[in-house]
Regions:
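Short strand-turn-strand beta-turns centered on an Asx-Gly dipeptide
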Residues: 784-788
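Inter-helical turn/loop segments and adjacent helix faces that build the functional surface
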Residues: 143, 147, 283-284, 429-438, ...
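Carbohydrate-binding/catalytic loop surfaces
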Residues: 351-358, 397-416, 443-464, 490-511, ...
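Catalytic cores of carbohydrate-active enzymes
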Residues: 155, 170, 397-398, 518-635, ...
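Anionic coordination/interaction segments
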Residues: 1-364, 377, 382-389, 425-430, ...
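Aromatic-lined, polymer-binding surfaces characteristic
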Residues: 317-320, 324-327, 338-345, 350, ...
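Aromatic-rich carbohydrate-recognition surfaces in CAZymes
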Residues: 368-488, 512-516, 520, 649-671, ...
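Surface beta-strand/loop "capping" patches
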Residues: 737-768
Length: 811
């Protein structure tokens, strides 16, 4: 693989050259502090929320430069008239070509090592498990036979505060800056006097800090003075020209933190030190953290704890073994890690997006369903947080922030169809049906009917009494069922799953076929919950509702060879053969399978149409053909360049919907081929693909783009990861939770003769060996549990805390 490879155990991706096609990044995080770091230490950090509590400066357009970041400049003063040697220990920002370089992105840490000028350096970046900071554990070795005297300059650029307000009003926000060197404790503080979101102004009580375990010989806090006029991090005047002025205060201008250290290295000698960067409430807490981690032993202990935690989280649960080692590497390690990152930070912080902060309702619902098999406690926590966003009328806020509460934007209409599936999966995984009786508050805010604003509402968000989780779900689904247009399909409103279909319902009349299908799936799941609690009458009510919506879909949503996508405010059907552009959409074909709406000849026709119009060498396109000009009745979906984003890209999230659908249809080889086309470690040309080989992209540029077909975009924070994990483990390998136990029903490529899944479930561990002697794609002939044959495909939990052998014979 060009540019790098996985370690032998698959737990690290090793990058062999600093100049990758795009920055290849990692997320280092605990539950509150997060650092995003590239292979050259570019990136930023935040505390609790990447918008409102950004620590370091960064913006998406910086991706092309991979700056600024977490740097250590090195300078060797040479004898006589020889010019000083200056370089950076992470290649960036000086870009001095090293003699040797390696970056290892691991689970919870990143290591950057290089050799230059006879000095080997290694920096391990990580975030401790329980503290609100990041540590840079630095090692320097003099590889020569002469003593070396080095000046070292750890460096970051502050943002400190609300990222969006900084982008909009940087000239004003900078005036709030106060950065200073604390002489008593030898550290630099970064602070803003006020927290400002719009006109909401309050005192900013958090203090960012930067320190080192080495003796401080100098310091800098003012960016312009440090860099010099018209310079960037690539030419810092203070270092290159020896103009380090020890300015202790930065007031009302761009601030940095840079410390100066002097290190003498005898021949072959190694020295270690640690840099501490973080944010706390109050200066005293920062000082305590700095003093703690100036002790190298404490820093190393924290590193081991971080490594142990992530290894336990990732390796200590589901493990698969198949004939495809690339498949195994992704499923066993990297997609799990990506699912964790998405669960912790949703769709907010990245190198690609603006970083709007908070967590999304529908995103978190899907992410927490995906993680339930490896961390059901986190799923339970998220379920109750999401449910608290539901209003009494059944609508919901689109998300929430740990710093500013529920999101007050107009929500997309699909929020109502995701949480029921998550609750169902949680109960199937744990048996904890008591969660349905948990009391959760209802949200009260300015929105009425999910569309209109109550002009009489004063203030922000409050609660409006409470109800059980079961009642919240019922209200959620009933609102979606009743909020329909003239054809009886749910209104699309501002948008459904596809954010970019944002004009089809701006008059609040447009309808969504896809949303109707997703609703049918959720209605059926709610029937199961009703049966679980013994409410027969309500179960029958929701069976009728599911049938009613199914009949409507098949009456007005079928186009002859596939399902339409929806109807605009003016009644124009799109996702139909008569529409110009966007004639067939992937989502409505996939969800016709997922919801059970498609039956008989419709079932076969949508598979044929999907293969004919949507599938390609890089995966299934979101729709076909792409829009070539603006369609005002649909919105910005038609404004993107052909093949990018929602305009007919290979949208990986949606493509995995279809992978699950194909497994439901028994098409194992097609499902496997489809999932492989999207796996980042299976791409053939990384100069084309560009994105990281170890995490999923949001999309690949689609086939109608003139020259970028197959390029990966918007990695890490995408619903793709959760659906990829579920598709692989629960549908292709076919080991999935059920209320009464583990359902084992694989859908394999015909070439696979055997595979296995190690699956913890309700306190037991089930080692499932799957045999496929005749190369079938679907069908279970026999199942044996600890040598005893059982009837059917359901393995009932033994609940004895032991390991059990399960032999599955397909046929």
């Amino acid at each position: 693989m060009k540019y790098g490879h996985f370690s032998s155990d698959g737990l690290e991706f090793i990058i062999s050259h600093p100049v990758t096609p795009t920055p290849w990044i990692n997320y280092l995080t605990n539950d509150k502090y997060c650092a995003i770091i590239s292979q050259c230490a570019g990136g930023y950090s935040f505390y609790r929320d990447c918008r409102t509590d950004r620590i370091l400066r960064w913006a998406p357009d910086y991706k092309n430069f991979d700056r600024p970041g977490r740097y250590i400049y090195a300078r060797e003063q040479r004898a006589g008239n020889k010019k000083s040697k200056v370089w950076s220990l992470t290649y960036q920002p000086l870009r001095v070509e090293p003699d040797a370089y390696e970056c290892r992105h691991g689970l919870g840490y990143t290591t950057i090592a290089q050799k230059y000028n006879g000095v080997s350096s290694r920096i391990i970046y990580f975030v401790p498990v329980d503290d609100d900071c990041e540590l840079w554990l630095v090692s320097l070795t003099n590889e020569t036979n002469k003593e070396k005297k080095l000046e070292l300059y750890p460096y970051v650029e502050w943002l400190v505060g609300d990222y969006h307000e900084e982008l909009r009003y940087r000239n004003i926000m900078n005036l709030y800056n106060r950065m200073w060197f604390d002489e008593s404790h030898k550290l630099i503080f970064g602070w803003k006097t006020a927290f400002w979101q719009g006109m909401n102004i309050k005192e900013f009580k958090n203090f960012s800090f930067f320190a080192s375990s080495l003796d401080v010989k100098g310091y800098a806090t003012r960016k312009t003075e440090f860099l010099g006029r018209y310079n960037t991090e690539e030419r810092p005047e203070a270092i290159l020209e020896g103009k380090f002025r020890n300015t202790a205060l930065c007031s009302g201008e761009d601030g940095i933190a840079c410390l100066k250290h002097v290190v003498k290295l005898a021949p072959k000698q190694t020295k270690e030190f640690v840099v501490v960067l973080g944010e706390t409430e109050g200066q005293s807490n920062a000082i305590k953290l700095v003093e703690k981690y100036r002790d190298l032993a404490q820093a190393k202990k924290a590193l081991e704890a971080t490594r142990d935690l992530w290894k336990k989280r990732i390796a200590g649960n589901i493990v698969v073994k198949t004939p495809d080692s690339d498949f195994d590497t992704m499923v066993n390690t990297w997609v799990k890690y990506q699912v964790y990152i998405c669960n912790l930070w949703s769709r907010s912080p990245s190198f690609y997006h603006e970083g709007s902060g908070g967590r999304g309702y529908r995103d978190s619902a899907q992410d927490s369903e995906a993680i339930v098999s490896i961390n059901h406690e986190l799923t339970r926590k998220r379920i109750l947080q999401i449910a608290a966003l539901i209003r009494r009328e059944g609508t919901s806020a689109p998300g929430w922030s740990d710093t500013s509460g529920p999101n007050q934007h107009r929500p997309n209409k699909d929020h109502q169809v995701w949480l029921t599936a998550t609750v169902r999966s949680y109960i199937q995984e744990t048996g904890d049906k008591a969660i349905l009786d948990a009391y959760v508050p209802y949200l009260k805010d300015k929105w009425v009917g999910g569309w209109d604003i109550d002009l009489q509402h004063k203030g922000g968000t409050t609660t409006d009494g409470e109800g059980t989780l079961f009642e919240h779900l019922e209200k959620n689904l009933n609102f979606c069922f009743n909020d329909v247009g003239e054809r009886g399909l749910p209104k699309i409103g501002h948008a459904d799953w596809n954010d970019a279909i944002d004009a089809a319902g701006k008059k609040h009349k447009g309808e969504s076929v896809w949303l109707a299908q997703a609703l049918v799936r959720s209605l059926k799941y709610f029937v199961e919950l009703c049966e679980l609690v013994g409410d027969k009458a309500k179960a029958e009510e929701f069976v009728r509702k599911a049938k009613t919506m199914t009949d409507r879909i098949n009456e007005v949503g079928w186009d002859g060879e596939w399902y339409k996508r929806g109807f605009t405010d003016d009644g124009i059907a799109y996702g139909t053969k008569d529409y110009e552009g966007g004639k067939i959409f992937l989502n409505t074909q996939a969800w016709a399978l997922l919801s059970g709406v498609a039956e008989g000849e419709k079932f076969d026709k949508i598979l044929k149409s999907t293969a004919k119009y949507l599938d390609g060498k890089h995966g299934m396109a979101l729709f076909y053909p792409a829009f070539s000009h603006f369609r005002p009745e649909l919105g910005r979906i038609s404004m993107f360049s052909e093949g990018t984003k929602e305009n007919a890209a290979v949208f990986c999230h949606a493509a995995h919907f279809m992978v699950v659908g194909l497994c439901m249809a028994g098409r194992g080889t097609w499902a496997y081929e489809s999932i492989c086309k999207l796996m980042p470690n299976k791409q053939k040309n990384y100069d084309l693909y560009k994105a990281e080989p170890y995490v999923y992209a949001e999309y690949l540029v689609g086939p109608e783009n003139p020259y970028r077909y197959g390029e990966g975009q918007f990695t890490w924070i995408t619903g793709t990861s959760g659906w990829a994990f579920m598709a692989a483990t629960e549908w292709i390998l076919g080991v999935r939770r059920d209320f009464a136990g583990l359902r084992i029903d694989p859908c394999l490529p015909s070439a696979w003769k055997k595979c296995s899944v190690r699956r913890p479930f309700r306190g037991d561990v089930y080692d499932v060996e799957i045999e496929n002697p005749n190369g079938v794609e679907k069908g279970v002939k026999e199942i044996y549990v600890d040598g005893t044959r059982i009837e059917g495909t359901l393995v009932k939990p033994l609940l004895d805390g032991k390991e059990h052998k399960v032999r599955v014979v397909m046929g």
